[in-house]
């Protein structure tokens, strides 16, 4: 026995993964932090995005690293091969998708969370109280009752899926979790607009209800769900035996940022006894802006709301969130008894409702900390002003487009998304988008509206200024002229000074 103990002790000598020289580690850590801060502070000196050279991709590929490497060498690889070729959404010229720019504050909070290495699946510790505090703040902002529940998730795609599952359980009862959806589940029907994000259809698929069970309702002239058409579709489905159980309204559609008439949809859902969910991935946080909040009238009547703090909230990725009006219905959709998850009257396992009772994950990172730091450090008033500013910049871009005969506005500007094109064919505009991205000047994206290829600018970065909008317009005119055989140099109209 003693020999076994001695052999075991020998095998675990120096088994800790902590640094052998903390002073050396501290110096390198400070250098990493300083260089990361420098990268954010001097972001304008870099291209928004740049293509990844084949050599860089090849340099990252290697066999399984069975032996140790010096941390400094690993960091060198990161600094040379990873950091310069990121998505680019820290840069103020990034306007491709609704990606928040992050903040230095959020970066520090992420580091602190990693230092704690807390699992927020459950048990009794203060990191969970931080998450619960944010749930309380969201209840207050959206005028939800004290009994409402909330949980952090990866993003709104997951939050929408979870909302579908909560609504499904509310419609079929908890036995459906044990026995499956059965014949009753096969008759469930959900509704959203044709302009809704594709993740809603995907949620129906993953939930086992099928994408065909999602009725995509036409939009009106303002690109909002046609409430009259929605009412008619619900009536038609009931007539042939379907059970309408869910309506997903959009607070900021993916293509142009339109907000459905939430109050009218809420009223219809109340009359019909249907779960009313709002996909507010980015638009829901307009609640922080006094001038934009009225656009969300009716969101306070929702049964559930999905949103992303990593979009307009500027929290580093990822930080999605689901808020549910009826906390007990939320719990019934996910809670599962297990001996290893038993609750005790005292000790580390104390508590009643744990986050794992409100979602599918037992292993959960401390997403709430960077959100808590962001909300506490900047305050909701300042974040609301940033959100309003991004919408003002979108209107500025709209004015630039309307003042330039070579550009065409393709949709009304509702919030922070602008869809337009160079007055040429789709092929030219498709090349223009790629040209601009590869130039590093800006990073727009694209979509298709009414059969036309559109250049899509989604302004979500708190660092973006009018000069960045001017640079985008100038780039579109320059590359559009080159691709269409026109003039290559264009002086942009000086609307910024007006």
Positions of predicted regions on the chain:
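Short beta-strand-to-loop capping motifs
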Residues: 324, 420-424, 459-461
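Conserved PLP cofactor-binding pocket of PLP-dependent enzymes
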Residues: 412, 417, 439-456
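PLP-dependent enzyme catalytic core of the Aspartate aminotransferase-like
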Residues: 449-498
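Active-site C-terminal subdomain of aminotransferase-like
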Residues: 253, 272, 297-402
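Short loop-beta-helix segment that forms the pyridoxal 5′-phosphate
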Residues: 138-166, 215-218
């Amino acid at each position: 026995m003693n020999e076994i103990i001695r052999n075991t002790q020998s095998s675990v000598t120096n088994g800790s993964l902590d640094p052998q020289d903390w002073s050396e580690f501290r110096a390198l850590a400070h250098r990493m932090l300083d260089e990361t801060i420098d990268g954010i502070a001097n972001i304008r000196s870099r291209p928004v995005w740049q293509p990844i050279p084949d050599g860089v991709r090849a340099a990252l590929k290697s066999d399984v690293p069975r032996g140790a490497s010096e941390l400094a060498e690993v960091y060198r690889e990161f600094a040379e091969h990873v950091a310069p070729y990121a998505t680019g959404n820290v840069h103020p010229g990034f306007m491709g998708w609704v990606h928040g720019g992050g903040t230095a504050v959020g970066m520090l909070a992420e580091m602190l969370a990693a230092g704690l290495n807390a699992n927020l699946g459950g048990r009794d510790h203060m990191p969970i109280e931080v998450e619960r505090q944010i749930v309380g703040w969201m209840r207050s902002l959206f005028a939800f009752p004290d009994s409402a529940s909330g949980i952090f998730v990866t993003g709104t795609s997951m939050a929408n899926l979870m909302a579908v599952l909560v609504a499904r359980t509310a419609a079929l009862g908890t036995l459906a979790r044990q026995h499956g959806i059965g014949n009753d589940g096969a008759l469930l029907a959900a509704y959203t607009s044709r302009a809704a994000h594709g993740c809603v259809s995907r949620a129906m698929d993953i939930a086992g209800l099928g994408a065909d069970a999602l009725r995509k309702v036409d939009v009106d002239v303002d690109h909002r769900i046609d409430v009259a058409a929605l009412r008619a579709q619900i009536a038609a489905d009931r007539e042939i035996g379907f059970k309408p159980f869910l309506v997903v309204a959009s607070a900021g559609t993916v293509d142009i940022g339109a907000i459905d008439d939430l109050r009218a949809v809420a009223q219809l859902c109340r009359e019909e006894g249907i779960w009313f969910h709002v996909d507010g991935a980015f638009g829901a946080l307009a609640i922080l802006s006094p001038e934009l909040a009225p656009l969300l009238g009716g969101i306070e009547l929702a049964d559930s709301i999905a949103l992303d703090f990593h979009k307009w909230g500027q929290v580093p990725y990822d930080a999605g969130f689901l808020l549910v009006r009826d906390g007990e219905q939320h719990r019934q959709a996910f809670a599962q008894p297990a001996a290893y998850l038993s609750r005790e009257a005292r000790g580390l396992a104390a508590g009643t409702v744990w986050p794992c009772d409100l979602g599918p994950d037992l292993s959960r990172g401390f997403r709430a900390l960077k959100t808590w730091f962001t909300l506490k450090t900047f305050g909701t008033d300042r974040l609301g002003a940033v959100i309003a500013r991004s919408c003002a910049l979108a209107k500025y871009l709209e004015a630039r487009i309307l003042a330039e005969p070579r550009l065409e506005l393709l949709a009304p500007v509702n919030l922070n998304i602008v869809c337009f094109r160079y007055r040429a064919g789709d092929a030219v505009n498709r090349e223009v988008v790629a040209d601009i991205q590869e130039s590093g000047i800006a990073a727009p994206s694209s979509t298709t509206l009414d059969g036309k290829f559109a250049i899509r600018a989604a302004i979500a970065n708190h660092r973006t200024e009018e000069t960045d909008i001017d640079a985008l317009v100038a780039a579109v005119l320059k590359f559009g002229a080159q691709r269409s055989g026109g003039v290559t140099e264009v002086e942009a109209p000086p609307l910024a000074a007006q």
